[in-house]
Structures are given as C-alpha cells and as structure tokens.
From Swiss-Prot:
This protein's name: Protoheme IX farnesyltransferase
NCBIfam families tied to this protein: cyoE_ctaB, PRK04375.1-2
Enzyme Commission code: 2.5.1.141
Record-stated family: Belongs to the UbiA prenyltransferase family. Protoheme IX farnesyltransferase subfamily.
Entry-linked InterPro entries: Protohaem_IX_farnesylTrfase, UbiA_prenyltransferase, UbiA_sf
One biological process term in Gene Ontology: heme O biosynthetic process
Signal peptide location: none
Described function: Converts heme B (protoheme IX) to heme O by substitution of the vinyl group on carbon 2 of heme B porphyrin ring with a hydroxyethyl farnesyl side group.
Organism per entry: Mycobacterium bovis (strain ATCC BAA-935 / AF2122/97)
Pathway(s) where this gene product acts: Porphyrin-containing compound metabolism; heme O biosynthesis; heme O from protoheme: step 1/1
Keywords: Cell membrane, Heme biosynthesis, Membrane, Transferase, Transmembrane, Transmembrane helix
Superkingdom of origin: Bacteria
C-alpha cells in the first residue's frame, strides 16, 4: 500500500482549504451580518411590505460584494497595526497567509463588480452609494480618521450606516426621510457598540498607536459618551416609528429601555469604582440592533396603519 501517495493529496487539499479560509477571513464575514440585518428591513419599509424577491436578491448580492471588497481593502490598509494587536494578530495579512497584492486585487475587483452589479440590477444611485461607501470606509476612516482622532468611529461609522441607504434607494431610486432615520440609528449605535469592545482591548490600541477613545480617555469619560450615544440611538428609533405602526414603536420602546439600562449600569459601575463588563454591552448591542430591525421588517410586511 502506497501510504505516501495517499498522504500527499491530503496535504495539498489541506493547504488549499487553509488558503481558501484565509481569503474568506479577509472579507470579515461576521461584519456582513450588519448588511443583512439592516438592508432587508430597509427594502421592506421602502415599499411598505411589498416583496420584490429578485430585486432584493440582487441588492443583497451587490451589497455583499461591496462589503467584502471594503473589508478586504481595510485589511490591506490595517496590516501594519493588525500585526501588533493581539486581537487581530491572526488575521491573514498579519500572519502573511495571503500576499498583499492578492488581497488588494481581490478588494478592488469586488468593489468594481459590486458597482456595476447594483447599477445594472437595481439602479445607478444604489451603485454610486456602494462605491462611495467603500471609498469612505477605506480612505476616510481606515487611512485617516482611525489613526488621527479619538472620534474616529463616530464619523467613520457612517460607512456602516450605508446598507440601509443602498437598500432603500435600490427599491425606490430615491432617498427619503425614513432612510435617513435608519441611517441615524446605526450612526448613533456604532460608538457605544465599538467603544464597549475597545474598552476590553484598550491596551491593544495603545500599543498600536490607534487613538480609539478608550485608549486615550478615562473609563468614566468613555462610559459617559457611551451613555449619550445610547440615548441618541433610542431617540432615533422612536423617530422612525412615525413611518411605521404601533408594533415597531412598541418594540423599539421596550428594546430601547433595555439597551439604556445596560448603558446606565456600565456608567454607574465605573463611577462607583466597581469591576465592569463592557464586553457584555458590546454583545448585547448586536442583539438590540437585530431586534429593532427585525421588528421593522415584520411591521413592514404586516403593513398595519402607520402612526403619523
């Protein structure tokens, strides 16, 4: 029996799978969940529950390509700091599992294809918004804001708000106030979500020289900012209720109270000098956003009379 002959193909297959997973990791699949959670409800609300399967599918495919392209280019731009941060040291470019030129080519290719896909399958506005989002995320946030100001995620977070704008514009060809309200929800939600995680890994940011707020400010200052932005997030969800029925409004109110309670507990714990668990707020903020936007999707499909 030729044992060597059987082992060699397995090694080749193992290397191929490892390489494939490395390229997949470049795209940050978990980040793309935000696209799905927010874009679908935005599309449903845009036409008050009317479902356009092919149009929605094309929008999601185009949006996912834009998101994966942006995430890949982000990894290229952040390779130097990823190498010195424990949380990101295992990313493909940080451990040189993927050549930088290949990652750059992949990111640019996905970005270009996403633009033409959305333009041809939906409309030009959606394609342009996707292209602007990628450019903003890579050049404005990653290369400029992230390394220069503690307010980096406040303004840079605008890129993460764009899936709702793209989804809305793909259905209507325009941008209306409910789309801006959804944009505001994610815009205000991003700082507490990101800063809660950064509190856990602030030493990483300090070593890398990235001025994330928790790395340059006291915990009391950070949690106060988290509390302010949490209030703004909840307020934005209630503004959106004017375009929905009582169902979404009720869920937004209850979920908002829960989110605010966690933010207040974190702030109170820091003020009292007690041990705190910011990672809990980070994880639960994901659940909060999912609950709000799932309620929006259900509300839109049921199409009950709106509140205004």
């Amino acid at each position: 029996m030729n044992v060597r002959g059987r082992v060699a193909p397995r090694r080749v297959t193992g290397r191929a799978m490892s390489t494939l997973l490395a390229y997949l990791a470049l795209t940050k699949p978990r980040v793309i969940e935000l696209l799905l959670v927010t874009a679908i409800p935005a599309m449903l609300l845009a036409d008050r529950g009317a479902i356009h399967p092919l149009l929605m599918l094309n929008t999601l495919v185009g949006g996912m390509m834009a998101a994966t392209g942006a995430n890949t280019l982000n990894c290229v731009a952040d390779a130097d700091i990823d190498k010195v941060m424990k949380r990101t040291a295992r990313r493909p470019l940080a451990r040189e599992a993927v050549p930088t030129r290949n990652a750059l080519a992949l990111g640019l290719t996905l970005t270009v294809i996403s633009f033409f896909w959305l333009w041809c399958a939906t409309n030009l506005l959606a394609g342009v918004l996707a292209l602007v989002t990628v450019a903003f995320y890579v050049f404005v946030y990653t290369l400029w804001l992230k390394r220069r100001t503690s307010q980096n995620v406040v303004w840079g977070g605008a890129a993460g708000c764009m899936p709702v704008m793209i989804g809305w514009s793909a259905i209507t060809g325009t941008i209306a106030w409910p789309a801006l309200a959804m944009f505001a929800i994610i815009f205000f939600w991003t700082p507490p979500h990101t800063w809660a995680l950064a509190m856990r890994y602030k030493q990483d940011y300090q070593v890398a020289g990235v001025p994330m707020l928790p790395a340059v400010a006291t915990e009391r200052q950070v949690t106060k900012q988290i509390l302010i932005y949490t209030w703004l997030t909840v307020a934005a969800t209630l503004v959106l209720a004017l375009a929905t029925s009582w169902l979404y409004g009720a869920v937004a109110l209850v979920a908002g109270g829960w989110f605010l309670t966690m933010a207040h507990q974190l702030y109170a714990g820091v003020r009292a000098g007690e041990p705190v668990r910011p990672l809990r707020l980070f994880l639960q903020s994901n659940n909060y956003l999912a609950v709000v936007f799932c309620a929006l999707a259900v509300d839109s499909v049921i199409a009950l009379p709106t509140l205004h």
